[in-house]
Amino acid sequence: MSGSCAAAEEKEGSRQRLQMKVNEYKENQNMSSVSLRSIQKTVLEKTVKVCLVPFSLSNYKSGQFKLPKSLLDKNSKNEVACKKYKKTEIKKACTRILTSKMEATASSKAESTLQKSSIDVHTENNQRQHKSTSDTVSLGVDTESSQDGDSDEDTTSSLDDFSGLSPYERKRLKNISENANFFASLQLSESAARLREMIEKRQPPETKRKKPKKKENETGCRRSMRLLNVDPSGVSLPVTPTEPTLVADENPLLPPGPLEMIPENRDDNSELFKEFLQTWAEVSKTSSKNIEKELSSLKTYKANLSGMVISEDTVYKVTKGAIFSIAFHPSEIKTLVAAGAKSGQVGLWDLTHQPKEDGVYVFQPHSQPVSCLYFSPANPAHMLSLSYDGTLRCGDISSAVFEEVYRNERSSLSSFDFLAEDASTFIVGHWDGSISLVDRRTPGASYEKLISSSLRKIRTVHVHPVQRQYFITAGLRDTHIYDARRLTPSGSQPLISLTEHTKSIASAYFSPLTGNRIVTTCADCKLRFFDSSCISSQIPLLTTIRHNTITGRWLTRLRAVWDPKQEDCVIIGSMAHPRQVEIFHETGEQVHSFLGGECLVSVCSINAVHPTRYILAGGNSSGKIHVFMN
């Protein structure tokens, strides 16, 4: 009786708690979202189940506990009947409670509370039913048996059949379950573990290099006692002083003083060379200085130029390197042309001698490029050559030697010209911008004056043909005219400066007969003609001619030079195709173009014209001379 009262009180308490939880949920119905984690937590909180089984005490003996047959025999009919009875009672109790409570709530939190209360009521009904039998009392506590497993599965399956969840919540739970199953099927953790193993396998193990063990009884290699600097007894010898190694100069200076005129391509004792020296001396006796030079008309001049042609007999390689200077012997009997090369050679070619190979003689009076070359106007038997090596030499045919006229080992020379008509004094330009006055009548090979100019570099020097006290210099970007009478060693200012140039100037020359014109060749691809008829503070610019002067580093720079027979025409090489040599008038008109066909296939950077005859010689960067003549 007391047991039934206690059960009734517990039932009443559980109903009150259930009612409080339902009311508590109703107060929170306006919440935007309710988590379902509490439902899962409520279902999983059950850890121990108590089951009352009918048990008979008639066969019980003292000191012995015997399980009923229905529990020992798993296949007995009583066990199956008990399971079916339990399932039926659970379903009935849950259905009855849910029917009365689901009308007032639709939330997942209330459903979890109802699930817990229904399980509690089911347990109480079973206890009351089993306690009503007076001769049966059974207490079973099972946490790990197969019967509890079956009851858990049955309870879970019964909970799955609940229809209290809304369709949205059912769909949400289904999606969560499907997503969890999908990610589990991907086996991401296993893939990550495999990748981690692969990365770890790729790293090679650090292996320490084993040091070779030295053999104790290893015999050393034999060594030279001379290299060890010891004597046979093992005593060290005194250290011998080492001599400094001398670096061979690529272009060593030739010894000072006169040099013998020995041809490098011939035997100096050959009959041909002796005949050549004799011919040179004979033709030099005939002087052309008394011949009057008359300026022909432009029409006549063009007609004479048209008759000048080139052939294979007038093309020959005279020097070993590029040609830097060319000069004609003034003889009208023989055609003798001289060329100064980059290698320091000076070549002489007698075009009247056949075969042409026998008329070429090559000498080595310098060790560096020969940039300026002239035959003496007073004595054509003298050939003067100036080189970068700082020497100015005179080749004398009568004595067959190259005399040293001027020597300066501190500065490189660039150009020179004759200050006096008798060729006794010279004006010499240096690459560092200084100017030297040299007098051949003074013993020795030194200068009379050394003047520092305002130019940083001097490329060419040229003396006025009439007023010989004036000379013009071409520098980096300026062209200056000086008066030789006003030169002082401390420094001299130019009389006039031609500032129209924008880039470096290759050359500047007075016109050959009167000196009334000046022509300059500039790297800005322009030829400029100035009016120098009056040497005053201003020299006006007359004409500018566009002409390509960009030769590059492998070709000698182009220079425009005057034709000695014509006061108003200049000759210059061309970069145009086909290769040619052009003649321009001071007005800018192109007077003539010398085309050679297959005989002229290179650029003739350096050109010269015979002073009295219509003969043109052009030198290229391989040492060849191309001659156009009537």
UniProtKB/Swiss-Prot annotation:
An annotated Gene Ontology molecular function: DNA binding
Segments annotated as WD repeats: 318-359, 365-405, 408-448, 453-492, 500-540, 542-572, 598-630
Disordered, as annotated region: 105-165, 199-219, 231-252
Composition-biased stretches (Acidic residues): 145-155
Keywords (A to Z) from UniProt: Repeat, WD repeat
SUPFAM superfamilies tied to this protein: WD40 repeat-like
Cellular component GO terms, alphabetical: heterochromatin; nucleus; site of DNA damage
Biased composition (Polar residues): 105-118
Pfam families per the UniProt record, alphabetical: WD40
GO BP terms, alphabetized: DNA damage response; regulation of DNA damage checkpoint
InterPro entries xrefs: WD40/YVTN_repeat-like_dom_sf, WD40_repeat_dom_sf, WD40_rpt, WD_repeat_DNA-damage-binding
Source species, domain of life: Eukaryota
Protein purpose: Specifically binds 5-hydroxymethylcytosine (5hmC), suggesting that it acts as a specific reader of 5hmC.
Family assignment from sequence similarity: Belongs to the WD repeat DDB2/WDR76 family.
Subunit details: Interacts with CUL4A and/or CUL4B.
The protein, known as: WD repeat-containing protein 76
